[in-house]
UniProtKB/Swiss-Prot annotation:
Quaternary structure (record): Homodimer.
EC number: 4.4.1.21
Cofactor note: Binds 1 Fe cation per subunit.
Disulphide connectivity of cysteines: none
Transmembrane residue ranges: none
Domain of life (superkingdom): Bacteria
InterPro entries assigned to the protein according to its UniProt record, in alphabetical order: LuxS_sf (IPR037005), Metalloenz_LuxS/M16 (IPR011249), S-ribosylhomocysteinase (IPR003815)
UniProt catalytic activity: S-(5-deoxy-D-ribos-5-yl)-L-homocysteine = (S)-4,5-dihydroxypentane-2,3-dione + L-homocysteine
Gene name as annotated: luxS
Cofactor(s) needed for function: Fe cation
PANTHER family reported for this sequence: S-RIBOSYLHOMOCYSTEINE LYASE
Name of the protein: S-ribosylhomocysteine lyase
Amino acid sequence: MPLLDSFKVDHTRMNAPAVRVAKTITTPKGDLITVFDLRFCRPNMEIMSSKGIHTLEHLYAGFMRDHLNSDKVEIIDISPMGCRTGFYMSLIGEPSAQAVANAWKNAMHDILTKVSDVTQIPELNIYQCGTFSEHSLEDAHQIARDVLAKGISVNLNEDLTLDEEWLNR
């Protein structure tokens, strides 16, 4: 089985909250797709609650689009990581890591200031959500407060890449 790109970086050296360009792909038609690792928590040290990350998933995707989409950038998807330490964001275009960090910061502000009640969580119903009873706005707010308190940095692949010899052991 091929080794996925996300497992070629040293998770013990990752900063969080932080943005990292995980991968860039040029499609056969010439479109550039960029995948970002949006790391909310330090791997193996912190974790987002299941209910908090689920609520954040419903809110974060929309607010990130509000702040990052443009005539040069269009978010395809933002999905939570199985390890519950962050999200992957795939988009058309190549915004700078700093532009992504700024959008992320603004999205966290929006979560705290624009969503004060669970009735304001988009798609929170049995028809549009696979586990609509598994949410916590309180946890999502705490995650947003933590991100804003810590600040968002940039993780560079060259600082995190695992040694080929170690990978091939």
